[in-house]
Swiss-Prot record:
It catalyses: RNA(n) + a ribonucleoside 5'-triphosphate = RNA(n+1) + diphosphate. It is found in: Cytoplasm. One of its GO terms (cellular component) is cytoplasm. Belongs to the RNA polymerase beta' chain family. Part of the RNA polymerase complex. Disulfide bonds: none annotated. Keywords: Cytoplasm, DNA-binding, DNA-directed RNA polymerase, Nucleotidyltransferase, Transcription, Transferase. The lineage of its organism: Archaea, Thermoproteota, Thermoprotei, Thermoproteales, Thermoproteaceae. GO terms for biological process: DNA-templated transcription. This is DNA-directed RNA polymerase subunit Rpo1C. It comes from the Archaea. GO terms for molecular function: DNA binding; DNA-directed RNA polymerase activity. InterPro entries: DNA-dir_RpoC_beta_prime, RNA_pol_Rpb1_5, RPO1C. Its EC number is 2.7.7.6.
Length: 379
């Protein structure tokens, strides 16, 4: 009888690493007989779950995501009064992901903390204050504009300064660095005054807006922070409105192995294409689960693979995955048909009929299922 160690060694060469680690963990406390039965059972299930050659996984994935997507639209209209079923959280976000939009409509970061900062609300709040961008507008109690004299006067809120852990010297140091053409900025006590050398109504309004946006502390781009408690893992984490993943990951209190942004392009630039692939699948799954829809994660990963296999994030569409197909007929079948065919003709492209779409258009055997079989004559 084969030993447990030999079987696990052979199993590690067959199973994917994450699945193998789960099996290894599960058999650790079992006797040899039960361990072998479990391993054989897992191996049988794994082998029978593999896709057969020629399986039309693309259309299965499209149906598996598209049909629940239709339900999501219907539910969104039906439950229009409920925030959790609103269109803004469902279909629009799904479109943002598959279109790989450059800027999401609601950029967010999920900032996870290292112990002990994640074990108490006070410790997590101290990190949140460190992350949130604080501008003069945040600290302002009162803003007065004198259009005749050409001055902007800002009165600071003492309670806000105390809450943010800032002093007048901190603010004064930042304000002293602020410079502008034909503008003089001074600070006396809790009052900041900006004066134009030559009064100008239009210019003074622009000066007011710029001064209020001067960053005093925090990370640029992070407009709001909200503390969240995860009861399952007994920890506090931070959700931010606005993202700056690279800057946040440099904080020693932040756990870089779990912190992420919902901005696909930012994740690609900071963490790489593999992290982007995982995020695409995770975001699609999260959007569907929020609507109470259960879809196998492997369908999401197939979409993610199609968007990232080239090493760069590409949208699903004529400017990305579909537009990069070798077949001119497949490209033409998606959008802008006439233009695509004319351009393909000018370049003298060949149609090899290797894909599904172009084969259907031409009435040829589709290269899926039994269509991939080619019989050879034996002489």
């Amino acid at each position: 009888m084969i030993s447990r160690e030999e079987l696990l060694s052979k199993l590690s060469q067959v199973l994917p690493q994450p699945l193998y680690k789960e099996v290894e963990e599960a058999v650790r406390d079992l006797d040899d007989e039960k361990a072998l039965r479990l391993v054989y059972r897992v191996l049988k299930l794994y082998v029978t779950s593999l896709i057969d050659p020629g399986e039309a996984i693309g259309i299965v994935t499209a149906q598996s995501i598209g049909e629940p997507g239709t339900q999501m639209i219907l539910r969104s209209f039906h439950y229009a009064g409920l925030r959790e079923f609103s269109m803004a959280r469902g279909l629009p976000r799904l479109i943002e992901v598959v279109d790989a939009r450059r800027t999401p409509s609601t950029p967010l970061m999920y900032v996870y903390l290292k112990p002990p900062y994640n074990k108490s609300r006070e410790a997590a709040e101290s990190v949140a204050k460190k992350i949130q961008q604080v501008t003069l507008e945040t600290l302002a109690k009162e803003v007065d504009v004198d259009y005749v004299a050409g001055t902007v006067t800002i009165t600071l809120d003492q309670e806000q300064l105390k809450y943010r852990g800032l002093t007048l010297k901190d603010v004064e140091k930042i304000v002293a660095k602020a410079k502008g053409k034909d503008v003089a900025i001074s600070m006396r006590g809790y009052t900041i005054t900006a004066s134009l050398t030559t009064p100008d109504i239009l210019k003074i309004r622009k000066i007011k807006d710029k001064i209020l946006q001067i960053k005093i502390s925090g990370i640029k781009g992070v407009r709001k922070v909200v503390l969240q408690y995860d009861s399952k893992n007994d920890e506090w984490y931070i959700v931010t409105e606005g993202t700056n993943l690279e800057a946040v990951l440099q904080l020693e209190e932040v756990d870089p192995t779990r912190t992420y942004s919902n901005d696909l392009h930012e994740v690609e630039e900071v963490l790489g294409i593999e992290a982007t692939r995982a995020l695409v699948a995770q975001e699609i799954k999260r959007v569907l689960e929020e609507q109470g829809l259960d879809v196998d994660i492997r369908h999401m990963y197939l979409v993610a693979d199609a968007m990232t296999w080239s090493g760069r994030l590409r949208p699903i569409g004529r400017h990305g995955v579909v537009g990069s197909k070798e077949s001119p007929l497949a490209r033409a079948a998606f959008e802008v048909t006439v233009k695509t065919l004319i351009e393909a003709s000018v370049r003298g492209e060949d149609e090899l009929f290797k894909g599904v779409v172009e084969s259907i258009i031409a009435g040829k055997y589709v290269p899926i299922g039994t269509g991939i079989v080619r019989l050879l004559m034996q002489f």
